[in-house]
A protein has these predicted regions:
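Cleavable N-terminal export/targeting peptides
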Residues: 1-40
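Short loop/turn motifs that connect adjacent beta-strands in outer-membrane beta-barrel proteins
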Residues: 27-42, 57, 76-94, 131, ...
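Residues that define the transmembrane beta-barrel architecture of outer-membrane proteins
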Residues: 41, 61-67, 92, 118-124, ...
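Transmembrane beta-strands of outer-membrane beta-barrel proteins
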Residues: 41-47, 78, 94-98, 137-139, ...
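Outer-membrane beta-barrel pore domains and translocons
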Residues: 48-52, 83, 101-103, 140-144, ...
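Extracytoplasmic loops and strand-loop junctions of Gram-negative outer membrane beta-barrel proteins
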Residues: 49-52, 109-111, 140-141, 195-202, ...
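Outer-membrane beta-barrel "beta-signal"
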Residues: 66-70, 158, 250-263
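Outer-membrane beta-barrel transmembrane domain signature
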Residues: 75, 86-87, 147-249, 263
């Protein structure tokens, strides 16, 4: 079994970012219809599904059931992008937080015969969200800390929520990520034993920018509690990582749909 991590794909990371930004936009939309400063506390829970490659660069797709979660209670948060943790700084323009987040890999049946699977782990994450001029900029970093995890991934994104009307919010986003050599080799590498068993060429991953994504997220508020969220986008691998024998397509589209309830 490989001893290094695979984090959430950039596809799912971007979806989580857009969903969080959309919730904040809903807060803004609601505040325009109310008096005084609304509380940031919220509990949003739902269920969705992502249509995404079985791993980054794969030819095959899978439908992956996913929770839709965005909880803020005081300094505590739990959401799809940043995991579970505490907001250390939280005001209108800047949020800085830290927590732990799952770091999933890929199944043995999803990769060529002879290539090991990557098992789940847990990573420590820190992030900062900066809001200004209607744009939400996010910087984050995740380090594997438990299980068979290891390696470091940094990510950055820009989102621009647009309130079309009280019911519809669209959020275009772009994102990119950088990974160290340990992560790159763990996810995209093929060692000598795997090469002999699979017939693939050996490949050793090195540190560098890993991918870039573009996403369009749409939220439709069914009523004051229920909302429907849909996302469509694409992720492209960058640089040397495209030379990995595991990569069949450098650019792959993806989608996400969820129904959520706000308590």
């Amino acid at each position: 079994m490989k001893s290094t991590i695979a984090r959430w794909s950039m596809t799912l990371l971007a979806m989580g970012a857009a969903a969080q930004v959309a919730v904040k936009a809903q807060d803004l939309s609601s505040s325009r219809q109310s008096v005084g400063q609304p509380s940031k506390d919220r509990i949003v829970i739902g269920l969705g599904a992502a249509v995404t490659p079985v791993y980054q660069g794969a030819d095959d797709y899978r439908v992956l059931p996913l929770p839709a979660i965005d909880i803020v209670e005081g300094r505590f948060f739990a959401n799809f992008r940043n995991g579970v943790g505490l907001n250390l700084v939280d005001d209108r323009a800047l949020t800085i937080g830290a927590g732990v987040t799952p770091m999933p890999g890929y199944r043995r049946r999803d990769v060529p015969t002879g290539v090991d699977r990557l098992s789940w782990g847990v990573g420590g994450r820190v992030f900062a969200n900066l809001t200004g001029g209607g744009v939400v900029a996010t910087l984050g970093a995740t380090q594997g800390i438990t299980g068979s995890t290891g390696g470091f991934v940094a990510d950055a994104s820009l989102s621009y929520p647009i309130i079309l009307n009280p019911k519809v919010i669209i959020t275009p986003s772009i994102a990119t990520s950088f990974a160290d050599g340990k992560h790159m080799d763990g996810y995209f590498g093929v060692n000598a034993r795997e090469a002999a068993a699979s017939g693939l060429d050996q490949y050793r991953g090195k540190a560098g920018f890993k991918d870039v994504s573009a996403l369009l997220n749409i939220v439709y508020r069914l009523d004051s509690r229920w909302s429907l969220t849909g996302s469509v986008g694409a992720t492209s691998l960058l640089g040397r990582v495209k030379d990995s024998p595991l990569v069949e397509h450098a650019t792959r589209p993806n989608g996400f749909l969820a129904l959520a309830y706000r308590f």
